[in-house]
Amino acid sequence: MLENLSTEHRNEKTMNLDEMSIKEVLQSMNEEDRTVALAVENEIEEIEKVVQIVTKSFEEEGRLIYIGAGTSGRLGILDAVECPPTFGTDDNMVQGFIAGGLKAFTKAVEGAEDREELAKEDLKSIGLNEKDTVIGIAASGRTPYVIGGLKYASSVGASTASISCNKNAEISKYAKLNVEVETGAEILTGSTRLKAGTAQKLVLNMISTASMIGVGKVYKNLMVDVQSTNEKLVERSKRIIVEATGASYEVATECYEKADRNVKAAIVMILLQCEYGEALEKLKGAKGFVKKAL
């Protein structure tokens, strides 16, 4: 089975990897990494379809759920945890599950990825339903945990998609949409945390960012739903208001505080010269889209 996966093949360019100088190793890695974005480009049309179903889930108050094992699971969790501070989502809107539970994020849990039923249990625990979208991530495209999750997701009517790094992946049989980014042989044979992991991260970035744009979390190219959870983000919020409105830093700061640190509301207040309450009403009527509120 493994010998049929391109991610498990030996890379002809790095047969003498153990004899290379440090610089040669780094140059080889860099050369291989340059091929990843091109491999992702080949899947843009399928990624677009995935974004459409995720956006639909969000519009219907559904959720985006990532499932994976090992590096794939960690990448899903990484994308999920960045959504609340970046886009102002609640913790449930985008979630990530890894085979073996959160403890597997820092330490491998032996055998967890081989059990289909664990994914079913994880998805059952959050009350997965037909409004949700489940995306299974597996570089090999054959992880039982991911297959089990996709099977269960389909059984409850949830939308499904898969991300793998091999063509004709096994998991593609269990999802409606399938992103198969063929990254090929790694410089270190079978180490799919390298090119395959990079490809998965790029695809996840695309899916979450484009979906959030689709539900009004972005104005122009500004992340106007940013949550001010630390000093850096407070300053970023004020700068976003300045960029969006052309107001002075002082005016932006004043409106930011008047708007209870709601960046969108502060922008509307300045551009429409209205009070906080009116700004909130306009945003509500525009379903959170700043451009429509204006």
Curated annotation (Swiss-Prot):
The keyword Lyase applies. Transmembrane segments: none annotated. This is N-acetylmuramic acid 6-phosphate etherase. GO terms for molecular function: carbohydrate derivative binding; carbon-oxygen lyase activity; ether hydrolase activity. Pathway: Amino-sugar metabolism; N-acetylmuramate degradation. The active site is at E82, E113. Residues 54-217 form the SIS domain. Keywords: Carbohydrate metabolism, Lyase. SUPFAM superfamilies: SIS domain. Homodimer. It catalyses: N-acetyl-D-muramate 6-phosphate + H2O = N-acetyl-D-glucosamine 6-phosphate + (R)-lactate. PROSITE patterns: GCKR, SIS. One of its GO terms (biological process) is amino sugar catabolic process. A lyase-type mechanism (elimination/hydration) is suggested for the cleavage of the lactyl ether bond of MurNAc 6-phosphate, with the formation of an alpha,beta-unsaturated aldehyde intermediate with (E)-stereochemistry, followed by the syn addition of water to give product.
